[in-house]
Amino acid sequence: MLPKRAYPVQDSNVHSQEKKIIAGNWKMNINHSQAVSYLQELNWRLIDNGHDFDACEIAVFPPFTDLRSVQTLVASDDIQISYGAQDVSAFSDGAHTGQISAQFLKDLDCKYVLIGHSEQRCLPCYPGNNSAINELNNKHDGLIANKLLRSFAAGICPILCIGDISPGDHFDATLSRFRSVLSHLKAISDKKHSIGYALGSKTHFLDSDQLHMLVAYEPSSAINSGNCANSGDIVRMAAAIKDIVNVRVLYGGGVNLFNASAVFNEDLLDGILVGRASLNASDFASLIKTCCL
């Protein structure tokens, strides 16, 4: 287990009190106008199904260009669906063309942000003139750690995605990468002024192994396959993650209407991250209903 550290944390009993979550990652689907009709339909279908929002949180992850439309609709119609972004910059501001800062996402009332998704990790890191970019170039775990800290600073809950980079990877390799991200996070946190300056007085620091984030386990062999990983492997991974640090764990990869309930209702899991099966509001509502019966 990693040594005690000063990280942004939640109260010690928070995880036992928090509800499970079903999240839909839209990826590069559904434009800003479609997002409005999608959320309206999903909301009334959930209400019509008698969904208990106090027992199970529903969240969606639209493309960046949809977020303002989603924010406006959720606020105006008092919709009880959470939302977040699919990625965030490792930098707070500056000359970083095409990147979106955590504070920009906070200004759009994002509750969550996905970090380290396998479809992002496979993108090449291009070198730049900025020394900070060069330092992070080809160091994905360090980059991810910086994104986590920017999210903490903005008051957004990150969902750290971990999994084998290739189907040939093993259980221990996935956990090794998770430990590597945490080690980078600790190293950055220990640098003079880096955390205090970034987070100011908004976040308290305690010696704790409980991070204010979620972890989504997404094995590459299951993503976009339509088939979940073996339930035994999922539970084993969730237990191992929670043994390293006290976080809520989601499962993602091949989740669909027919397997979602079995995965969602595993005792060690705190929810599921759904991809393709969340792109149709009616289908997603049906999936949610099967999980929450």
Swiss-Prot record:
<dbReference type="GO" id="GO:0004807">
    <property type="term" value="F:triose-phosphate isomerase activity"/>
</dbReference>
<dbReference type="InterPro" id="IPR035990">
    <property type="entry name" value="TIM_sf"/>
</dbReference>
<keyword id="KW-0963">Cytoplasm</keyword>
<keyword id="KW-0324">Glycolysis</keyword>
<comment type="pathway">
    <text>Carbohydrate biosynthesis; gluconeogenesis.</text>
</comment>
<dbReference type="InterPro" id="IPR013785">
    <property type="entry name" value="Aldolase_TIM"/>
</dbReference>
<protein>
    <recommendedName>
        <fullName>Triosephosphate isomerase</fullName>
        <ecNumber>5.3.1.1</ecNumber>
    </recommendedName>
</protein>
<dbReference type="InterPro" id="IPR022896">
    <property type="entry name" value="TrioseP_Isoase_bac/euk"/>
</dbReference>
<feature type="active site" description="Proton acceptor">
    <location>
        <position position="218"/>
    </location>
</feature>
<dbReference type="InterPro" id="IPR000652">
    <property type="entry name" value="Triosephosphate_isomerase"/>
</dbReference>
<feature type="active site" description="Electrophile">
    <location>
        <position position="117"/>
    </location>
</feature>
<dbReference type="GO" id="GO:0006094">
    <property type="term" value="P:gluconeogenesis"/>
</dbReference>
<keyword id="KW-0413">Isomerase</keyword>
<comment type="similarity">
    <text>Belongs to the triosephosphate isomerase family.</text>
</comment>
<comment type="subunit">
    <text>Homodimer.</text>
</comment>
<dbReference type="GO" id="GO:0019563">
    <property type="term" value="P:glycerol catabolic process"/>
</dbReference>
<feature type="binding site">
    <location>
        <begin position="25"/>
        <end position="27"/>
    </location>
    <ligand>
        <name>substrate</name>
    </ligand>
</feature>
<comment type="function">
    <text>Involved in the gluconeogenesis. Catalyzes stereospecifically the conversion of dihydroxyacetone phosphate (DHAP) to D-glyceraldehyde-3-phosphate (G3P).</text>
</comment>
<keyword id="KW-0312">Gluconeogenesis</keyword>
<dbReference type="Pfam" id="PF00121">
    <property type="entry name" value="TIM"/>
</dbReference>
<comment type="pathway">
    <text>Carbohydrate degradation; glycolysis; D-glyceraldehyde 3-phosphate from glycerone phosphate: step 1/1.</text>
</comment>
<dbReference type="GO" id="GO:0046166">
    <property type="term" value="P:glyceraldehyde-3-phosphate biosynthetic process"/>
</dbReference>
<dbReference type="GO" id="GO:0005829">
    <property type="term" value="C:cytosol"/>
</dbReference>
<dbReference type="InterPro" id="IPR020861">
    <property type="entry name" value="Triosephosphate_isomerase_AS"/>
</dbReference>
<dbReference type="GO" id="GO:0006096">
    <property type="term" value="P:glycolytic process"/>
</dbReference>
